Amino acid sequence: MRPSDGPGITVVGIAKEFESLVDCLYNCGDYDMQATIIETLLRYTTRSVRHKMASAWFPNYVKLQSLFLGIKDFESDCRTFLGHFNEGLSDKKQVWSYPMMFCTVEGRSLVKPEDLAEFWVDFNFGPGTVSFYYVFKVNNTTETICI
């Protein structure tokens, strides 16, 4: 996934829809939904629009704005951004993410995706799930287990 660099959508007229997405980012309580929202914001805005809107979307948190604007390698950079984002929510936090040393399901060891620095497990209080990504060795694709 690459952020949009083309003409994209202007801020005028669509800003409210993006604000609704950002509100959902703060309240959905689900890592996968949060990652999808970030991907949407990156795909449907130009770099210049993101620079203009980052301070409105993530007010009073310059590091978070910088992490958002610095997303290049989506999987790892988004994971870093959302880790800081969720930690910053303190008592309103609904997603807890922790690195795992290993994961075994029904006696089978699962393999960490190569594009992630660590093997993460997400506790999502919005939908009440636990999820993690792993590599499915049969076809070498990244899959998600959601409990």
Residue ranges and their predicted role:
Residues 3-4, 30, 146:
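Helix N-cap and loop-to-helix transition residues
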Residues 2, 23, 27, 43-47, ...:
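Positions within ordered alpha-helical repeat solenoids
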Residues 24-33, 69:
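Short coil/turn segments at helix-helix junctions and helix-capping linkers
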Residues 15-24, 40, 59-65:
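Alpha-helical solenoid scaffolds in eukaryotic proteins
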Residues 65-147:
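N-terminal recruitment modules of adaptor/scaffold proteins
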Residues 1-18, 34, 44-58:
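Elongated alpha-helical scaffolds that mediate protein-protein interactions in large eukaryotic proteins
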